[in-house]
């Protein structure tokens, strides 16, 4: 008699996607981050659901309701700390997942890659509106600055800003709709994840060698399911330790102060995981130019498959020059953003941000395609 998981209409779908999925036998730990992102999404939805039961989206009580959760709700402090720090771990896994896709040429699976970029935008939107909800000083001013960027849109900019705000400033209407978006968007992300997986399983997973692995595949369970469990254990242990011992390490001290529209913080900045994009926004003096560059810094990921000039699937892994350029990109992403953006707008941080922004776009649009073309010429 056939197993129920192979015959039941619903269980058969889950079985083909998780249990009996043919998987390349040589995928490394870098392929764990997809499942870790799924774990982060589930953890964020669950903790967020419990927080939403006690949170009030009213500017008069939002800040005190978060304090109430931490002080009076059973394990509310733990749930809040796991949710706040879970967002950071979500983005760590997300950026590592994207980096692996770039390094090993997974972007050539165009549908999967483009849905992944849409997922990145959705997660960034979710994190942004969620950051506003505690109604702290940096939350309020961050929302004011970022939403005000819509005023750079020609002709309809001011109307757009007032439409998003629900008035003439960031106020009660803004907080209410941001809470609604923050509750809704994770479920849209979950739906997009399913589409991402459907496209991925149409073509099959990539592997470190970039070769066709149809003749060398093994079932996902038990080989890689147990491997993923190790990743789950490491992630949950690290997240729990951070939430218990240093819960405010990745936060902003200004958010311990209730939002005050009359007092502007000395330096308005977003959470650390948005700094690379904020660095590009701030490096351009013109508002419209900065907004376009900000969007381009994310959407240029969709251009990566189109700018692939190498005859190899994964030039970053196999060619010394493109490998060097890839690690230059990683070097630009990590140290230069916090260095130039966690500081005031003054010399030399402005010029560092501008140089890093030029390097960022040059790598994707010029240097990496040129290196692939040069490699093809060398191999002829």
UniProtKB/Swiss-Prot annotation:
Residues given in the record as heme b b566 binding sites: 97, 196
Compartment(s): Mitochondrion inner membrane
Membrane-spanning ranges: 33-53, 77-98, 113-133, 178-198, 226-246, 288-308, 321-342, 349-369
UniProt cross-references to Gene3D superfamilies, sorted A to Z: Cytochrome Bc1 Complex, Chain C (1.20.810.10)
CDD domains reported in the protein's UniProt record: cytochrome_b_C, Cytochrome_b_N
Keywords for this protein: Electron transport, Heme, Iron, Membrane, Metal-binding, Mitochondrion, Mitochondrion inner membrane, Respiratory chain, Transmembrane, Transmembrane helix, Transport, Ubiquinone
The protein, known as: Cytochrome b
Native organism: Tetraodon nigroviridis
Gene name as annotated: mt-cyb
